[in-house]
Amino acid sequence: MRVALGIEYDGSRYYGWQRQLDVDSVQGQLEKALSKVANEPITVQCAGRTDTGVHGTGQVVHFDTNAIRKETAWTLGVNVNLPDDIAVRWVKVVDEEFHARFSATARRYRYMIYNHQLRPGILRSGVSHYRGNIDEDKMHQAAQLFVGEHDFTSFRALQCQSKTPFREIHEVNVTRQGMYICVDIKANAFLHHMVRNIVGTLLEIGKGNQPKEWVNTLLALKDRSKAAATAQPNGLYLVDVTYPEHFQLPKLALGPLFMLD
């Protein structure tokens, strides 16, 4: 039997999503909890692996199991065995053809910026703090230059293992609510550090340090060293994964939940 789960987590105290030896990971904690409920070893496949300090409100995973359990076992039962900063949000038994990663047609991230001279207290692990004047309208205008299929060599990590630097961005929106700026970006897939590198570049434009046309220059250069510094991890959320309608997966309100959808 193949089971899909919707997962939410605060990634601030984990060394990323992927299971690793000798360090705590979101995948490791989830598999441990699932294995207790299934009474057999469980390995999960995810829609997108997030880095150290990055959060997820719309992560999707699947796993195969011989265990027959009620839905409440895979939700309430697993949540009882998870740390407080990881939670199962929904469950669905799916066809064998479903794959959390390869069936996905798009991923959506939101990057939350706290734009204020003084650092935050309560939300310090859920937002990235940037001081000074930031023009979100300039950021939004520049962000439109990323839309479409491009070679994102200038915006991927040097250690990125993807065989191709080409990705297609479907839409990018930059909005402000008071002190909070949200960069909302959807694409078919993302390269390692791609969202944070894009945000770093947009911040330089929003601060007035570069013109919006800098985006086109960086895309053409295909050189990571010419782009802006990588933005902090703690403001980044994987908020949604898109799948073909016939899988009929549950849809929740987009996060993070302290922001209006």
Curated annotation (Swiss-Prot):
One of its GO terms (biological process) is tRNA pseudouridine synthesis. The keyword Cell division does not apply. It comes from Shewanella piezotolerans (strain WP3 / JCM 13877). Substrate binds at Y109. It comes from the Bacteria. This is tRNA pseudouridine synthase A. InterPro entries: PsdUridine_synth_cat_dom_sf, PsdUridine_synth_TruA, PsdUridine_synth_TruA_a/b_dom, PsdUridine_synth_TruA_C, TruA/RsuA/RluB/E/F_N. Keywords: Isomerase, tRNA processing. GO terms for molecular function: RNA binding; tRNA pseudouridine(38-40) synthase activity. Pfam families: PseudoU_synth_1 (PF01416). The keyword tRNA processing applies. Formation of pseudouridine at positions 38, 39 and 40 in the anticodon stem and loop of transfer RNAs. Its EC number is 5.4.99.12. Homodimer.
